[in-house]
Amino acid sequence: MNPVSEHVDGAALRVHVVPGASRTEIKGLHGDAIKVRVSAPPEGGKANQALVDLVEDTTGGRASILSGASSRTKVILIRGVDAGSVQRSFR
């Protein structure tokens, strides 16, 4: 399954997040999601904000968590870009 899909408001990106990592980085695929390591701890929304910041910096769109805010597997909505450009950003 592709981790990127079209959404009525832009593109949806499925991610598997590893908080508290030594650095923030994209690490390839984890099942049907893109694996992202963030250095921020999973406390007070810090890891979620680090993830949103990374996705925005990588894609150039506006990102928000669509589902999974308290889970390691999340779906991120990226406004202002299409699924094809998001796929190219994460290659």
Show where each model-derived region lies:
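Contiguous, often N-terminal, cationic amphipathic patches that form binding interfaces
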Residues: M1-D53, D57-S70, K74-R91
